[in-house]
UniProtKB/Swiss-Prot annotation:
PANTHER family reported for this sequence: CYTOCHROME B
Subcellular location: Mitochondrion inner membrane
Cofactor note: Binds 2 heme b groups non-covalently.
Miscellaneous comment: Heme 1 (or BL or b562) is low-potential and absorbs at about 562 nm, and heme 2 (or BH or b566) is high-potential and absorbs at about 566 nm.
Amino-acid positions noted as binding a ubiquinone in the UniProt annotation, renumbered to this chain: 201
Family statement drawn from the similarity comment of this UniProt entry: Belongs to the cytochrome b family.
UniProt name for this protein: Cytochrome b
Pfam family, one: Cytochrom_B_C
Species of the source: Martes zibellina
Single GO term (MF): metal ion binding
Transmembrane segments: 33-53, 77-98, 113-133, 178-198, 226-246, 288-308, 320-340, 347-367
Quaternary structure (record): The cytochrome bc1 complex contains 11 subunits: 3 respiratory subunits (MT-CYB, CYC1 and UQCRFS1), 2 core proteins (UQCRC1 and UQCRC2) and 6 low-molecular weight proteins (UQCRH/QCR6, UQCRB/QCR7, UQCRQ/QCR8, UQCR10/QCR9, UQCR11/QCR10 and a cleavage product of UQCRFS1). This cytochrome bc1 complex then forms a dimer.
GO annotation, biological process: mitochondrial electron transport, ubiquinol to cytochrome c
Outcome of mutating residue 150 to V: In strain: Isolate MZI-CH6
Length: 379
């Protein structure tokens, strides 16, 4: 009798995606992050659902409701901190996943790559709106500053900002709609992730060598399921160490002060995972220019496939490109550090140089170095 997982219409889809799916035999631990992101997303949806049962999206009670969750709800504190630090783990996995794609040339699957970029924007939007919900000082002022950036759009900017706010400032209407969007977006992300996976399974996985691996495939289960479980255990270990030992390590102390429109915090800054983009935004003195640079800092990923000039797919056998890649990583870490610093000398100059270098590496240096490497192959 044929196995039910190969005949049942629904089980067949799962079987072909996660059990009998032919995977390259040489994919490394850098290929673990897709499954880890799936785990993060499910974890965020589940913890978020339980938080939403006790949270109130009203300016008068939002801050108190979060306090109530931590103090009065059974295990509310662990759910709240798993959700907050789960977002950090989500972004760590996201950055490593995108970095893997850049390093090994996974962007040569344009459909999968472009859906990935849309996913990145959707997750960033979700995280931003989630940060507003506790209604602390940094929530309020972060929302004010970031939504205000849209006023840089010529002609319709001011009307657009007031339309998003639902009034003339960030207030009750803003909080309510942000809660609604924060609730629905993860389910949209889930649907997009399914499409992302669908496109990936049309082409099959890339591998470290960048050479087609059709002649050497192994079944996903048990080889990669066990590998993914190991990665998941590491993820949960790091997350629970954060949650149980230093839950506020990655947060901002200002967010334990209730939102006060009359008192501006000395340094308004977003969560750590947005600091690199925030540093690029602040590096440009012009408001509209800064907003465009902010959007383009992520959107630049969409033109990376068009600028691929190398004869080889990945960077495994391209030492010059590897040097540039790790320079890009160092540059992003520098931008993250600068984003959390006050706007004063020497941080302004460092931020501007790091921002120029970020775009230069992706748009100019990478394609140029690839051409040089192509010529070196002839020698």
């Amino acid at each position: 009798m044929t196995n039910i997982r190969k005949t049942h219409p629904l089980a067949k889809i799962i079987n072909n995606s996660f059990i009998d799916w032919p995977a390259p035999s040489n994919i490394s631990a850098w290929w673990n992050f897709g499954s880890l992101l799936g785990i993060c997303l499910i974890l965020q949806i589940l913890t978020g659902l339980f938080l939403a049962m006790h949270y109130t999206s009203d300016t008068a009670t939002a801050f108190s409701s979060v306090t109530h969750i931590c103090r009065d709800v059974n295990y509310g504190w662990i759910i709240r901190y798993m959700h907050a630090n789960g977002a950090s783990m989500f972004f760590i996995c996201l950055f490593l996943h995108v970095g893997r794609g850049l390093y090994y040339g996974s962007y040569m699957y344009p459909e999968t790559w472009n859906i990935g970029i849309i996913l990145l924007f959707a997750v960033m939007a979700t995280a931003f709106m989630g940060y507003v919900l506790p209604w602390g000082q940094m929530s309020f002022w972060g929302a004010t500053v970031i939504t205000n950036l849209l006023s840089a759009i010529p002609y319709i900017g001011t009307s657009l900002v007031e339309w998003i706010w639902g009034g003339f400032s960030v207030d009750k209407a803003t909080l309510t709609r942000f809660f609604a969007f924060h609730f629905i977006l993860p389910f949209i992300v889930l649907a997009l992730a399914a499409v992302h996976l669908l496109f990936l399974h049309e082409t099959g996985s890339n591998n470290p060598s960048g050479i087609p691996s059709d002649s050497d495939k192994i079944p996903f289960h048990p080889y990669y399921t066990i590998k993914d479980i190991l990665g998941a255990l590491f993820l949960i270990l790091v997350l629970m160490m954060l949650v149980l030992f230093s839950p506020d390590l990655l947060g901002d102390p200002d967010n334990y002060i209730p939102a006060n429109p009359l008192n501006t915090p000395p340094h308004i800054k977003p969560e750590w995972y947005f600091l690199f983009a925030y540093a690029i935004l602040r590096s440009i003195p012009n408001k509209l220019g800064g907003v465009l640079a902010l959007v383009f800092s992520i959107l630049v990923l969409a033109i990376v496939p068009l600028l691929h000039t190398s004869k080889q797919r990945g960077m495994m056998f391209r030492p010059l490109s590897q040097c540039l890649f790790w320079l890009l990583v160092a540059d992003l870490l520098t931008l993250t550090w600068i984003g959390g610093q006050p706007v004063e000398h020497p941080f302004i100059t460092i931020g501007q140089l790091a921002s120029i270098l970020y775009f230069a590496i992706l748009l100019i240096l990478m394609p140029a170095i690839s051409i040089i490497e192509n010529n070196l192959l002839k020698w």
